[in-house]
Swiss-Prot record:
Binds 1 Mg(2+) ion per subunit. Its cofactor is Mg(2+). Belongs to the anthranilate synthase component I family. The gene is trpE3. Tetramer of two components I and two components II. L-tryptophan binds at residues 269-271. It comes from Haloarcula marismortui (strain ATCC 43049 / DSM 3752 / JCM 8966 / VKM B-1809) (Halobacterium marismortui). This is Anthranilate synthase component 1 3. InterPro entries: ADC_synthase (IPR005801), Anth_synth_I-like (IPR019999), Anth_synth_I_N (IPR006805), Chorismate_C (IPR015890).
Length: 503
């Protein structure tokens, strides 16, 4: 089962390389069968270098990926100054990278045989819109990506043993023969590490009583935020605003162990583990912000939530309630309209289409209303331009987007950071896939941070909106409990008083 098999022959590699410009990357592919891709990642990773693991369970990409030890890091700091032309430093960093990196894939079918993998903060929005600086900044970067020239990929969903495609993408400068041999060496080394490496994670378990999540505000203060937004709705400033609060707890268990538990507790279409300098992300995101494949664009907005039922019958009743709720239907329609308009900014005229409308997707703790919107990218529009058009997602800001982001900054105490930004990947042959970073633990400064939010409209009930945020947090907190080896009581504390609901 652990035999390494090369599927790229030298002749086809050389033929592809000779037809490409100098500096182009050309993949060399090896294959190996493993019992579990995440175990392979745990064996290949190293405590002293960056790594990523992206897993889909029915998302649009249909593939999972992992990589270790990037050849380049791309980071934009929290205090980045605007570009000379007034543009976004973060998106210009992406543009610059994609301008100098090119892939000629030959017969390789892996969508991302190499690329830039990482995350963008919600605060990239400050580079795109004039948002007041009223929330507290904790210094987290605006953007962190690693350039990985050798990755492991596999098709999702999978059951039982999995064939992993290890793709190494050396640059071809002068000698295609030498590049081919470099590629074989790179692919072989990653495959061998994935099979035979040692698992380096050493969690230091902490008593669950010392790992209780605490809300920055609690139910009463969150209700005040909801009432403040409802006043803005009455005044005509906004139709809908997504408001969140931050939960924190000591980092009692390693992010790798936490993500392993997340995979079992709440598998999600755009799950991710990122281990980057100073910041680790553990994500169980269900939502796609943007998928680009050549000139084809996709976005998949989520708006409308119910908790899962305790029985199949109760689950069906909750779905009927969700689909018939006029508030949820109206909110979903409004946000689909917003996403259509955003995608239309960079799409060919008449190409934007709602391919699926208000389907119901189920997860371990909640169910959602979901739609799928497609478009065709206009000529001479870059992938970074497409990201700018839709970022941040309308479902986690509100409408109208610019004014709503000002309101968010006014009512939320702390900056969102990675929350409601994006995790994903940029390929080197006109493709990208980015989620919306929700249901995500941020491991920073020896603690876990988990932001959860809810969309507020004119008839929102503050207590119900707070409970919805706890429903959304439940799966991640349960995963932390499982990684701790505890049966979670799911209790939350505010700064001043204990609250039922979350641990």
């Amino acid at each position: 089962m652990t035999e390494i098999r090369f599927s790229t022959d030298k002749e086809s590699f050389i033929e592809t390389a000779r037809a490409a410009a100098d500096g182009t990357r050309v993949p060399v592919e090896a294959r190996v069968t493993v019992a579990d891709p995440f175990e392979a990642y745990r064996r290949a990773r190293d405590e002293n270098t960056d790594g990523f693991y992206l897993e889909t369970t029915g998302g649009q990409s249909g593939w999972g990926y992992f990589g270790i030890e990037p050849i380049e890091r791309v980071e934009v700091s929290a205090g980045a100054t605007p570009a000379q032309d007034g543009g976004s430093p973060s998106l210009e960093a992406i543009d610059d990278l994609l301008d100098r990196e090119h892939l000629e894939r030959g017969d390789c079918t892996v969508p991302y045989p190499c690329g830039a993998f990482g995350w963008l903060s919600y605060d990239v929005a400050r580079e795109l819109e004039d948002i007041p600086e009223t929330t507290v900044s904790d210094g987290l970067p605006r953007l962190q990506f690693g350039v990985f020239d050798c990755i492991a990929a596999w098709e999702e969903p999978h059951d039982g043993n999995v064939e992993i495609h290890v793709t190494a993408c050396p640059t071809v400068d002068g000698s295609p023969e030498s590049a081919f041999e470099r590629g074989r060496t790179m692919a072989r080394e990653l495959a061998q590490d994935a099979i035979h490496g040692e698992k380096h994670v050493q969690s230091q378990p902490t008593a669950a009583s010392q790992a209780t999540f605490e809300s920055e505000c609690g139910e009463a203060a969150f209700a005040d935020r909801v009432r403040q937004i409802k006043q803005y709705v009455r005044d005509g400033d906004t139709f809908q605003t997504n408001v969140s609060h931050r939960l924190t707890a000591p980092a009692a268990v390693h992010p790798v162990d936490t993500f392993d538990a997340v995979r079992r507790v709440n598998p999600a279409p755009y799950s991710a583990l990122l281990e980057f300098p100073g910041v680790d992300l553990v994500s169980a995101s269900p939502e796609l912000l943007l998928d680009v494949d050549g000139d084809q664009l996709l976005t998949e907005p989520i708006a409308g939530t119910r908790p899962r039922g305790a029985t199949p019958s109760e689950d069906e009743d909750l779905e009927v309630d969700l689909c018939s709720d006029e508030k949820e239907r109206a909110e979903h329609a409004m946000l689909v309209d917003l996403e259509r308009n955003d995608l239309g900014k960079v799409s060919e005229y008449g190409s934007v289409d709602v391919a699926e409308y208000r389907r119901v997707d189920r997860y371990s703790e909640v169910m959602h209303l979901v739609s799928l919107i497609e478009g065709e990218l206009r000529d001479a529009v870059s992938i970074a331009d497409a990201v700018a058009a839709v970022f941040p997602g309308g479902t986690i800001t509100g409408a109208p987007k610019p004014r709503t982001m000002e309101i968010i900054d006014e009512v939320e105490r702390t900056r969102r950071g990675p929350y409601t930004g994006s995790i994903g990947m940029f390929g080197f042959d006109d493709r990208a896939t980015l989620n919306i970073t929700i249901r995500t633990l941020v491991h920073y400064d020896d603690e876990y941070r988990l932001r959860v939010g809810s969309g507020i409209v004119h008839d929102s009930v503050p207590e119900a909106e707070y409970r919805e945020t706890l429903d959304k947090a439940r799966a991640l907190v349960t995963a932390v409990d499982e990684a701790l080896g505890e049966q979670g009581s799911f209790a939350v504390e505010s700064e001043t008083e204990p609250m039922e609901g979350m641990r």
